[in-house]
A protein has these predicted regions:
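Feature marking well-ordered beta-strand scaffolds used for ligand recognition
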Residues: 1-117
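Soluble extracellular-acting proteins and domains
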Residues: 79-189
Length: 189
């Protein structure tokens, strides 16, 4: 999923989902309102940054604000949890273009699944089958257990799935890569 933050000099913060670049959508915003109700006074945010699970907004007049996303119809608890797992390196510099990666973790797979469900690209039954497998994987991984049978089920569960849009193809591809990684962890545990 491709989400970006935008700061507004005379306003607040907008959060957009541009996964489908031909149809970007605002999914969240924050705005304190004007500094002065009558006079035009410089305000708003210089910039916003996502780092380590939080959104930092540097205000022109009012200082620093720190935000945390909450689940909504636009972003699920799994997607937020997966975003918090993203590795951006140990150095924070918003001007860098670091490669971001996610671990092979069931919550990351669940985030991909939530996106496919939201776009109506997967049936409820297929989604529930995968959720059941992911629940089993969480238990085994927490116990440092192994299961070649579960690993194989995770690798093959989406083989019969097909999607109709480029965006959904990307989401399904990402899900399959994470499932392969979880499978490898279940064999190597």
């Amino acid at each position: 999923r491709d989400i970006f933050l935008q700061a507004w000099y005379q306003g607040g913060i907008s959060i957009f989902d541009f996964t489908d670049s031909s149809n970007p959508r605002e999914i969240a915003f924050f705005d304190r309102g004007p500094i002065d109700d009558e006079a035009l006074v410089s305000g708003g945010f210089w910039s916003t940054y996502w780092y380590d699970g939080k959104i930092y907004g540097t205000g022109i007049v009012r200082g620093l604000d720190v935000f945390e996303l909450l689940p909504s119809e636009h972003i699920s608890e799994n997607e937020i949890a997966a975003a918090k797992l993203a590795s951006q390196g140990n150095i924070f510099n918003p001007q860098q273009q670091l490669k971001v990666s996610w671990p092979a973790n069931p919550v990351v797979a669940s985030a991909h699944l939530d996106q496919l469900i939201r776009s109506k690209s997967v049936s409820v039954e297929k989604a529930q089958d995968l959720r059941n497998l992911l629940d089993r994987a969480v238990v085994l991984l927490n116990q440092k257990g192994k299961s070649e049978e579960l690993a194989e089920s995770l690798r093959s569960v989406t083989n019969s799935w097909s999607v109709k849009t480029k965006v959904s193809e990307g989401q399904l591809s990402g899900l399959r890569q994470i499932l392969i990684g979880i499978s490898e962890r279940l064999i190597a545990s």
